[in-house]
Amino acid sequence: MLDLNNFDRIRIGLASPDQIRAWSSGEVKKPETINYRTLKPERDGLFCERIFGPTRDWECHCGKYKRVRYKGVVCDRCGVEVTRSKVRRERLGHIELAAPVSHIWYFKGIPSRMGLLLDMSPRALEKVLYFVSYIVTDPGDTGLIKKQLLTETEYRDCRERYGNAFKASMGAEAIKKLLEEINLEELARELRQELKEVTGQRKIRAIRRLEVVEAFRKSGNRPEWMILEVIPVISPELRPMVQLDGGRFATSDLNDLYRRVINRNNRLKRLLDLGAPDIIVRNEKRMLQEAVDALIDNGRRGRPVTGPGNRPLKSLSDMLKGKQGRFRQNLLGKRVDYSGRSVIVVGPELHLHQCGLPKEMALELFKPFVMKRLVNDGYAHNIKSAKRMVERVRPEVWEVLEEVIKEHPVLLNRAPTLHRLGIQAFEPVLVEGRAIQIHPMVCTAYNADFDGDQMAVHVPLSAEAQAEARLLMLSSNNILNPKDGRPVAIPTQDMVLGIYYLTVEKQGVPGEGKAFKDPEEAVMAYYNNAVSLHAAVKVRMPGMGRIETTVGRIIFNEVIPRELGYYNQVIDKKVLSKIVDDCYRKLGFSATSKLLDGIKKLGFTFATRAGVTIGIQDITIPARKKEILKEAEQQVEKVEQQYRRGLITEEERYRKVIGIWNDATKEVTDALIETLDKFNPVYMMANSGARGNIQQIRQLAGMRGLMADPSGRIIDLPIKANFREGLTVLEYFISTHGARKGLADTALRTADSGYLTRRLVDVAQDVIVREVDCGTGQGIEVTEIKDGNEVIEKLEDRIIGRVALEDVKHPETGEILAFAGEEITESEAAKIVAAGIKKVKIRSVLTCRTRYGVCIKCYGRNLATGRQVDIGEAVGIIAAQSIGEPGTQLTMRTFHTGGVAGDDITQGLPRVEELFEARRPKGQAIIAEADGTVEVREVKGRREIEVTAEDGTKSVYQVPYGARLKVRDGDRVYAGDELTEGSVNPHDLLKIKGVQGVQIYLLQEVQRVYRLQGVDINDKHIEVMIRQMLRKVKVDEPGDTDLLPGGLIDIFEFEDENRRIKNLGGEPATAKPVLLGITKASLATDSFLSAASFQETTRVLTEAAIKGKLDLLLGLKENVIIGKLVPAGTGMSRYRNISVVAESEPGEENGEPGGERLYGMDELYGETAN
């Protein structure tokens, strides 16, 4: 018995007419759908019950047999088999065509597969198929040539001249005959021979033909199967017809298209039986061909067939394509049961691992569990009465619900889910009201706020799902951000402000200078109003002796675990982040979530006690503002005078004025910071990192400064006022440009960023950690990344958590600082940097040799846990999310520096896209192709650079007008160095510097864009993407292999093929590496299911069908599409046989695979957190 749910590969191919007949349950002969009086399907029509099965369970069409007991009986009156009605989703019918027609995908695609096989141009093919010209199928011994086209008149002349000595016909029949005659083996041999003899265009054509011939030869498809004699009719449930209120019917477009085919087919049959004249029959055949084309792919050829309201009908191809198609709408994104959504509000009293679930929502979501419990506990006798109890909401139902949800985690998701922290698991707590409550510290991960955001709840049902939710997805286990390994669950806003207020010191307050024997006494004194929170006091701390601190800091340190020491400083957001990080590294998840809850409680308490509010008088304008502005105005006047006298150019004037005003703005800002009191609420908010920053305070109390106009050019008239004083009309108008641009930018950016993420996910979705060590001896050498003189990424950041390729030795003492094959820890990295080492060789994803993924050693540390990555981790998806999620923070705009030509380099999101798509960059730099010495000279007003290599060969580069040189006369340059300013074309770099050169360039460029915008992403995520872009090679000379010249093939497959040929003693193939953009790389993946669900669905499927492609189901998408567990994480085959055993008694603990106990949350959070 074929098990439909358990298969490990899937193949696609062309169906032969016999195959289609074998699948079919009967022939559809009439175009009728349902009888308008009885509303029952017509016999032999498109919804016929005899072909497709009964419309009602266990009931035949005429009603002779009703009930399950007649299961499998075929009614003798109406011929309907008595069975379940859901077979109407599974059974196919067919239409026997009176004349063969071609399949539009294979005739019309680019390149036309039929045309290549027959060596005909698509135009000639179209003329034959659509009955314009005759084609000679057998010239006999006449002067005609095989496959020659004849017009109507030419055909008549030839008939008169040669009689029946030759055969010529038109339509798909003629093409079918020609396709049947093709001998693939022989054709392949001829083409291979031809390849050796011809060059140029003819060679390219021969390669293309050979590709198609080889595809047919290897897959076992026959060319004549591209011509259809039988058309399958898909199941009626997949093209339903439903009655609307008002007696009208709504139907799927496919039914209309099928009806046209059947009508025309029946008419053609009748004409053939009557022996109608040739011209009428031909017209009918052409119409049949067009009807079938419209059914398969409407609009591909000619004008699409339209329905009411001039709307093109959706054909079979359209059912698969696009966001609303079968792939993306139903297979990759399904709606799920046991889910709900509601508005979110803050739940400050929750623990980190909890969420508040509205009672009525919880009851509905956990209904089946509650019903089962009611029966088990004896409240109800059977499920039916239990259901009634739940629906009537009896009081005992609530008690049972409380028990059911205990220790049963639920998943919360907020759209858009940009990274994996957008779905986390929580333990539900029942709350009154109708809003979901969430813990304030998970807002950062969800990017949620409480201005009306909504969230969705999902219930994991099986024991396995619950265990995974608890161990992998619980919010207290997701404290670190996978993109950079820094804590993401950190205090924000009020909490930060409260802690800052608590730990800040103030002079001249009650109790200053007092001494206490222990911390408890000091806190007691504060509660008895004997000493202020901010007073500097002396306290004897256990194990630390006497220290000077404040009461607030003592209170703060009560929630800090002993192991982290005593924090005697003002605590702002940065410090808090570091405390959380240290706590996690030293003490693990449970201690960190306790700490976070402690900080949350303290923060909110003291933010409330502080009573920090903002009034208009808190915005103090610096007294020096007037004189600073006066000074600046005088300087500007001087510059204007010089310009009027013609001493400086407009450009210089503009630059100077901008410079003057920027300095003035900075001076006002400095003056402002000096005037602000340290306890000024506005200052406290900005300084603690709770909300706002100095730039915003500057606009409130300093001056707004310079603004940009709509093109991005800075207007040289500053806004001198601030918001407290109020803007003049002109100032207000000038500032609207920037505001509008900001909003437009954000809207565009969101969509672009989402699309980039989708492409990234698609290209990397099958990168999974598959083995411990791939055994490669290669790696990359990393240094710090610089932009000019500014360090963008420190060496330390680049090596922490990576595996050293070779021992790192101290340059002076020779001491080994890090061993080869071991992970470099934070402390080792610090030692390496301290020893003055500038370059370190590490293992990298870029050089990993694992076939379908990466290995542990090349990947290194999993940033989300801070430990070594596990086998089965879907690192490709994590990488795509880490790069895509901050995409919305990148700017869209191209910066214009005062309209200077040649300075416009793309930055922000468009630059990231340009790099990942491997496009030719805007403002391309010229690069040296070999090492040598530079000579710059001017020829006829054009500059050119000549590079003389060591061996005396010279290469000359023309410098385009307006380009800036990066080299001077006599400079020494190396291959791949930039000679002019701008961005390098990565494809050129690949030719000159090879794979490693382009890898490092792309990595550094992507990092540069993100770091300049203040976004930290770990190198390894970008490396995963770059590796996917360089997976393929292009075959140059095939040698004795079966490869085709110019074909793209996976590096590993290429090496396998060469190994095979070498072992047989043959000539191996040669190839060059190619760099594919992420879109191309996704479409070039081995899995046709993954490629088809991404873009260009019809093209991918056409090609896959001809090649008879096999999908090994290695990636995640393919498995989601066919409804299997994904082969990553716990879905990997090595983890499949582990089962979760339910606990027999609530008191007993069950061991969990992996050695951790399945802990109850009450142990983690004892009374201390409350």
From Swiss-Prot:
InterPro entries: DNA-dir_RpoC2_beta_pp, DNA-dir_RpoC_beta_prime, DNA-dir_RpoC_beta_prime_bact, RNA_pol_asu, RNA_pol_N, RNA_pol_Rpb1_1, RNA_pol_Rpb1_3, RNA_pol_Rpb1_3_sf. Mg(2+) binds at D449, D451, D453. Its cofactor is Mg(2+); Zn(2+). It catalyses: RNA(n) + a ribonucleoside 5'-triphosphate = RNA(n+1) + diphosphate. Keywords: DNA-directed RNA polymerase, Magnesium, Metal-binding, Nucleotidyltransferase, Transcription, Transferase, Zinc. Zn(2+) 1 binds at C60, C62, C75, C78. Binds 1 Mg(2+) ion per subunit. Binds 2 Zn(2+) ions per subunit. GO terms for biological process: DNA-templated transcription. GO terms for molecular function: DNA binding; DNA-directed RNA polymerase activity; magnesium ion binding; zinc ion binding. It is an enzyme of class 2 (transferase). It comes from the Bacteria. Its EC number is 2.7.7.6. Zn(2+) 2 binds at C774, C848, C855, C858. One of its GO terms (cellular component) is DNA-directed RNA polymerase complex. It holds the Pfam family RNA_pol_Rpb1_1. Residues 1145-1170 are annotated as: Disordered. Belongs to the RNA polymerase beta' chain family. DNA-dependent RNA polymerase catalyzes the transcription of DNA into RNA using the four ribonucleoside triphosphates as substrates. The RNAP catalytic core consists of 2 alpha, 1 beta, 1 beta' and 1 omega subunit. When a sigma factor is associated with the core the holoenzyme is formed, which can initiate transcription. This is DNA-directed RNA polymerase subunit beta'. It comes from Pelotomaculum thermopropionicum (strain DSM 13744 / JCM 10971 / SI).
